[in-house]
Structures are given as C-alpha cells and as structure tokens.
Regions:
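Basic, polyanion-binding surface patches
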Residues: 1-164
C-alpha cells in the first residue's frame, strides 16, 4: 500500500528545488496563463527536452491539453520571491501585471529579467495520478542574468543559495 499524500509531501518538502514560472499560450485563443512550478527537470540534451508536472485542477492543465499548446519555463532569481508568490496565489488576470514580459518564438510569455528561460512545444505527455507530466522540446532559450543566484524552495519556504 502506498504512503499517504501527507507523508509524501512531508518527505519531499525536505528536497530543495528551483522555482519557476511556467507560462502558457493557447493557440486556440489569445489566452495566456502562468503558474509557479517547482516540479521541473531536464530530461535529455539531444533532443533538448525538459519536463514540468501540472495538477489536473490547474487552468494550465486545460490550456496545455489544447492541440498545439506551447509553454515557457522561466527560472527565477533569488530576488523574485514576490513574483513567484504572485503566480502562486493571485487570480489569473492579476498575475502578469508585475514583471516585464516578451513573447517567445512559440508565443508563450517570457519574463524579460528571469535568471533563464526555455521556450517549449509539447513533445509528449503522461498522466500520472493527480498530475500530467509534460515533456517540452526546447525551441529557444536564454540566460538574461547569468550572475544572479537562483530562487530555491525548501521546507515550505524560499531560500537563497549561499555556498560557492
């Protein structure tokens, strides 16, 4: 029998992760959406693939299920906690009011002063419990602020990278 969801979350909160804002553009409309995501990882350098895990209850899930949907992963710097909170807690229409946004090759919004970003098309997807894992093929990327330390999340709070 698997462990409880509560036990699972309790264990995983002890694993530090980077913080990203995943932004989505639906080709079926002009709707854009974004949410804070820590379930992000690299998959393959050839072809360049990454993954994000999105809850089925999220608006992002509905948009990513649209044929031809694209998304960007904006990797946040240590000075972007407020923006992370904005995309975690505010209503959809208020999220993009902060930050300066450009449009990536795929049409997904990219944060101009992100530490780094990856612009992706949906390569494949896998339903996994309450979430779907989206594999994104990276179409474009940049590191606008290479000297900035990343924003980290560990044990229910934001952390800064202090060791060199």
């Amino acid at each position: 029998m698997p462990i409880s969801s509560e036990s699972f979350r309790d264990v995983l909160r002890h694993f530090p992760s980077g913080v990203t804002i995943v932004t989505i553009k639906s080709p079926a409309s002009e709707v854009v959406h974004g949410l804070t995501v820590s379930a992000f990882a690299s998959v393959s350098p050839d072809p360049p693939l990454i993954l994000v895990s999105i809850d089925h209850r999220a608006t992002a899930y509905e948009l990513l299920e649209t044929a031809g949907a694209s998304f960007a992963v904006n990797i946040l710097g240590h000075d972007q906690m407020e923006l992370s909170n904005r995309f975690a807690w505010l209503k959809d229409e208020d999220r993009f009011a902060a930050g300066e946004w450009d449009t990536a090759v795929t049409g997904a919004p990219i944060l101009r002063d992100a530490l780094a970003w990856l612009d992706c098309t949906v390569y494949s997807r896998f339903a996994a419990g309450s979430h779907t894992i989206y594999i994104g093929e990276v179409q474009a990327s940049d590191v606008p602020r290479p000297d900035v330390k990343p924003l980290l999340y560990w044990n229910r709070g934001y952390r800064n990278l202090t060791a060199k």
